[in-house]
Each structure stands twice: as structure tokens, then as C-alpha cells.
């Protein structure tokens, strides 16, 4: 990338500081911007990063789940934003060599939490590929599975969860979501809904652009075709084994 283009990126990202994020997952959008600026050796606001990290730590409720702000709500915001952006902020700050916090150590701890959360997500997928629709922002569709896809992409799936079973589970969930439910309008764009056109499922901030957060579950596409995620023989996922009377790993509290 030429220097002029680099400086344009820096200028535009820096201009986002006018946004005063509320005490919610929005803090991580700010930390993502500032950690990027740190990594490219531009002027960055360390306070915006560290204050976001402190709040996310404060909002951890245990066993892989975060509260999106001071009051807990049962939704998929751990999937849409919190787990992925928390990990990415910590990784980027560590890569940038920023001193102050033990960003690498915090990343290791956050990774374990995401592994437990991804284990739960895998267990959410029913034997026939459905997963529960609950909480706000459900028109983001398959973005609910982003951390599971991310752990597959990282090569960091939790023990007892194989790459093949994740591939098979996600594939079946994609089929259930997109095969025959009128998910696209006449222009070929996604409709507002969890699966199909369900405008009543929208929140006031839902728009046609945000629907494409569903593509966040495509992270394993970053793996080469020769990767074991793609080449391993199909395997049943947890709920298939459980409902067919086969042995499956016992779940338990992690922390």
C-alpha cells in the first residue's frame, strides 16, 4: 500500500474519535480502531483501548459469558462483538508491542473464555441444524456462530470439539438458514429477519447493511482447501450424538 493511501486510512480512522461510545459493546469498536492505529505506528489513544478492556473484564459473568454493559441480557452479543473484538484488540496491542498491560496474558485468558463459549454454541446446533433465536439483533443470522467459526479459523477449538463436527454443524445450520426461506429480496439483497423476511424481528438500529454481519461466520473460508477442517471425514456434532444415544463429552463449568 502506498504512503498516501496509508495516511488516508489513518486520517479516516482517527476521525472516528468524535463518537462517544456508550458503556456497552460499543467500547470495543473504539478499541479496535485505536489498536489498529497503534499497530500501524500512528498516534493512538491508549486510554480508549485500556478503558474498554477494563470494562469488558468487569462485565465477565463466568463460564464463557459476558454482560453487554452493567446489566446482563441473554443474547448473542458475545458472538456478534464481544468475544471476537476483545480477542482481536488484545492480539493487536500485543503485536504492536504496546507496554502497560500484559496484553498477551489477557489474550490467553480471553481465548479460554471464547473456547468455552464456542463449545456452548456448537451445542446450540440441534441434530437437524437449527439453533435458537433469542435476544436482540437476531437478523444478523449466522453471526451468532462467529466465535465458533473463529476458533476453527484460529485452530483453537476446545477439547472434545473436532474440526469435522464443526464443519458439519455449521454447514447444516447454513442450509437451514438459507436454502428455502426467501432470505433475499427482488434485488438479491438480504431481507430483514432471522430466516426469511421477518421485519418485526428488527431493532431500531437494524439496517440492510448490518444484515451482512452474517458473513462473519465465514471465517473458516480463510483456511486453505488442504486444511484438515475441510478434508477430515464428516463427523456428528454434539446434539446428534446426544439424541442418538451415543457417547458425547460431559459439559461442566470452566470458570
Predicted features, each with a name:
Residues 102-184:
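A beta-strand-loop signature enriched in Asp, Gly, Thr, and Trp
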Residues 147-255:
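Terminal, non-catalytic domain-edge segments
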Residues 11-20, 57-64, 112-124, 169-184, ...:
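Short, mixed-charge aromatic SLiMs
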Residues 39, 58-61, 90-94, 119-126, ...:
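Generic secondary-structure signature for well-ordered alpha-helical cores
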Residues 1-111, 123-146:
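Aromatic-lined, polymer-binding surfaces characteristic
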Amino acid at each position: 500500500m502506498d504512503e498516501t493511501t496509508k495516511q488516508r486510512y489513518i486520517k479516516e480512522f482517527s476521525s472516528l474519535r468524535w463518537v462517544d461510545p456508550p458503556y456497552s459493546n460499543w467500547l470495543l469498536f473504539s478499541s479496535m480502531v485505536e489498536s489498529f492505529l497503534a499497530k500501524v505506528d500512528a498516534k493512538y489513544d491508549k486510554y480508549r483501548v485500556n478503558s474498554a478492556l477494563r470494562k469488558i473484564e468487569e462485565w465477565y459473568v463466568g463460564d464463557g459469558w459476558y454482560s453487554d454493559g452493567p446489566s446482563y441480557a441473554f443474547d448473542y452479543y458475545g458472538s456478534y462483538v464481544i468475544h471476537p473484538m476483545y480477542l482481536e484488540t488484545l492480539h493487536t496491542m500485543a503485536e504492536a508491542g504496546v507496554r502497560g498491560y500484559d496484553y498477551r496474558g489477557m489474550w490467553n485468558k480471553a481465548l479460554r473464555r471464547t473456547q468455552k463459549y464456542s463449545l456452548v454454541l456448537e451445542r446450540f446446533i440441534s441434530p437437524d441444524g437449527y439453533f435458537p433465536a433469542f435476544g436482540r439483533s437476531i437478523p444478523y443470522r449466522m453471526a451468532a456462530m462467529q466465535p465458533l467459526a473463529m476458533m476453527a479459523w484460529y485452530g483453537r477449538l476446545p477439547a472434545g470439539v473436532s474440526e469435522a463436527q464443526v464443519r458439519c454443524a455449521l454447514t447444516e445450520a447454513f442450509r437451514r438458514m438459507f436454502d428455502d426461506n426467501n432470505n433475499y429480496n427482488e434485488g438479491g439483497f438480504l431481507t430483514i429477519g432471522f430466516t426469511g423476511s421477518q421485519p418485526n424481528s428488527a431493532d431500531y438500529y437494524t439496517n440492510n447493511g448490518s444484515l451482512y454481519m452474517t458473513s462473519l461466520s465465514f471465517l473458516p473460508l480463510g483456511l486453505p482447501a488442504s486444511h484438515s477442517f475441510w478434508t477430515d471425514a464428516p463427523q456428528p456434532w454434539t446434539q446428534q450424538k446426544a439424541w442418538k444415544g451415543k457417547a458425547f463429552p460431559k459439559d461442566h463449568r470452566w470458570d
